[in-house]
C-alpha cells in the first residue's frame, strides 16, 4: 500500500502455469517484483481499473521490467464496466475475486459527481455471490456479502433510511443523505443539492 495515497497494487498468479498478472500500479512495487522473482513467475498482464494517477504511477516501471502495458482486457478476466468514479473505470472478476478499484471499498464507495451512476455500477457488483472476495483500490479487503449488509451506501440503496440532515457542501446548502467512514479517515457522503441532484463527495467537503 502506498503510504500517502493508501492505494493498493496486486500481484496474482496461476499455480500450474506460474503465469502472473498485476492489477494497478500505484503502490510500492518492489515487494511484488521480488515476489515475482522468488516464485519464478512469468508476468503476462497489467490490468488497470482506471487511469487516475494513484493507480497507474508504476506503469512505466512494470513495462520496463516485464514488458507489460496497462490494459482492461484479458481472456481470463471478466471486465465489468463500472463508471462513476472515473469514466474509464472497470472492475475485474478473476475466479472468486473481484478487483473493485475505486468503486467499492470496505464500508464506503468511490466518490463522483453523479450518485445514480455510481449506484448503478455498485449494484452490478451486488449480483456477485456473497462470498466473493473484494480487493479494492485502497486499504482493506472485504466481501460482497459484508458490504451488502454493512456498507451504509448499500443499506440506503437497498431501502434503508436516509439521514436527511441539513449540511453545506463547498458553501452551498445541501442535505446529507448517507455518511460512512472512508479509507482516508475523513468520511464519505452522499449529498443532495437544492436542485435535487445527488453526488458522492469526500467528507472534508461537508459542513455538518
Residue ranges of model-derived segments:
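A contiguous pocket-lining binding segment that forms or flanks enzyme active sites
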Residues: 102, 108, 112-130
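Active-site metal-binding motif and surrounding structural segment of the metallo-beta-lactamase
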Residues: 29-71
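Accessory terminal helices/loops
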Residues: 120-134, 139-208
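Short active-site oxyanion
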Residues: 18-21, 42-47, 131-133
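Histidine-centered catalytic micro-motifs
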Residues: 46-56, 80-89, 134-142
Amino acid at each position: 500500500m502506498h503510504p500517502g495515497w493508501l492505494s493498493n497494487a496486486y500481484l496474482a498468479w496461476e499455480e500450474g502455469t506460474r503465469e502472473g498478472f498485476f492489477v494497478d500500479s500505484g503502490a510500492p512495487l518492489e515487494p511484488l517484483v521480488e515476489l515475482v522473482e522468488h516464485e519464478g513467475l512469468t508476468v503476462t498482464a497489467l490490468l488497470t481499473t482506471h487511469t487516475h494517477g494513484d493507480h497507474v504511477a508504476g506503469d512505466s516501471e512494470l513495462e520496463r521490467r516485464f514488458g507489460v502495458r496497462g490494459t482492461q482486457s484479458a481472456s481470463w478476466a471478466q471486465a465489468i464496466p463500472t463508471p462513476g468514479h472515473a469514466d474509464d473505470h472497470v472492475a475485474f472478476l478473476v475466479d472468486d475475486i473481484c478487483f473493485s478499484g475505486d468503486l467499492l471499498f470496505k464500508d464506503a464507495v468511490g466518490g463522483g459527481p453523479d450518485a445514480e451512476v455510481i449506484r448503478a455500477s455498485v449494484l452490478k457488483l451486488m449480483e456477485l455471490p456473497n462470498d466473493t472476495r473484494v480487493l479494492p483500490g485502497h486499504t482493506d479487503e472485504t466481501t460482497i456479502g459484508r458490504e451488502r449488509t454493512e456498507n451504509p451506501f448499500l443499506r440506503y440503496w437497498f431501502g434503508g433510511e436516509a439521514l436527511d440532515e441539513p449540511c453545506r457542501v463547498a458553501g452551498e446548502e445541501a442535505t446529507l443523505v448517507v455518511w460512512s467512514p472512508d479509507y482516508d479517515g475523513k468520511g464519505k457522503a452522499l449529498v443532495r443539492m437544492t436542485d435535487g441532484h445527488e453526488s458522492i463527495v469526500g467528507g472534508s467537503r461537508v459542513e455538518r
